[in-house]
């Protein structure tokens, strides 16, 4: 039965050596030759086979040429394990014996961790060990690893950056993207979809439209590149816009430009005039007769204003002020003409002592009326 695999640790790498199955005589010869070829240890003798020992022995580690074994503590030569009494040297990763039945060793560690090779190899041990391996038809051990050739130290490249700039990390590279279409934030005011810069667009009424969306809202006529009218925020063509316009209350034509609204109708400025003098009323005040004819104020007062019975002038408001018409005994008077005929005091329209006390179709104040009545004459 094979012995338990030995585990050795070198340079922080775990190496597992599996002993091969060989004849006892061949293994013992290899051990004996290795022990005899080891120099500088005269007190150790060749291993002997114990009577009744098993048919499987232990294969000892070996050192390649150019490696010096580390000194170990002295071990008594009286060992009963059937092998050599020489303590095994420390096993290195690069110095493990490659066997036919063993797994290949792992890659060597960096050159900095490897110990420098010895300059004086043990020629006697190497020669005897190679001859024994040739008899067993085994390949010779690999040559010791050579130290890496150190090149010239790297020279730092001259830097033209300032110290503050050298401390800053490089900016991240922006990914290069190739969009299929350019981004746009314009939205069509009709279909509420994005207006791409590659599409024909119309800008009107401070909004963006697709060329096919900018149409008359009544007849759906294309308005791109055409004159249009705006009404209530909607684009209209000229015929549809004229259909929405009001017609003049006098001539019956459509009012396209300036419009005058009066009497619940629309008029052209040239149609809204005085029926007497044909003067344009415009934004001035006007008056109507019983037939709803339009008059300017001057012509209306001349024709329809009452006449004062004292001065015989029409009672017309002046300077934009309202004028009151005073009626008494079927006659009309100006406010300034409504006075007592004897003392010329202004009469009040209220029934007070300052009011009018007529006598024989004449205007008197109360004191004058009493005097005239007492005298019995007018």
From Swiss-Prot:
**Which stretches does UniProt call biased (Pro residues)?**
103-115
Segments of this protein annotated with the region Filamin-binding = 1-69
Name of the protein in question: Filamin-binding LIM protein 1
Coarsely, its chief localization is other
Q: Where in the cell is it found?
A: Cell junction, Focal adhesion; Cytoplasm, Cytoskeleton, Stress fiber
> One cellular component GO annotation, for this chain's record?
stress fiber
Q: Does the keyword Zinc apply?
A: yes
Alphabetical keyword list: Cell adhesion, Cell junction, Cell shape, Cytoplasm, Cytoskeleton, LIM domain, Metal-binding, Repeat, Zinc
Q: Where is this region: Disordered?
A: 38-179
The record's Pfam families line, in alphabetical order, gives: LIM
Origin organism is Bos taurus
- Renumbered to this chain, region (PLEKHC1-binding) spans 281-378
Outline the extent of the LIM zinc-binding domain.
186-247, 248-305, 306-375
Function per UniProt: Serves as an anchoring site for cell-ECM adhesion proteins and filamin-containing actin filaments. Is implicated in cell shape modulation (spreading) and motility. May participate in the regulation of filamin-mediated cross-linking and stabilization of actin filaments. May also regulate the assembly of filamin-containing signaling complexes that control actin assembly. Promotes dissociation of FLNA from ITGB3 and ITGB7. Promotes activation of integrins and regulates integrin-mediated cell-cell adhesion.
Subunit architecture: Interacts with PLEKHC1, FLNA, FLNB and FLNC. Interacts with NKX2-5.
**What's an example Gene Ontology biological process for this entry?**
regulation of cell shape
Name the InterPro entries on file. Znf_LIM
What one GO molecular function would you report for this record? filamin binding
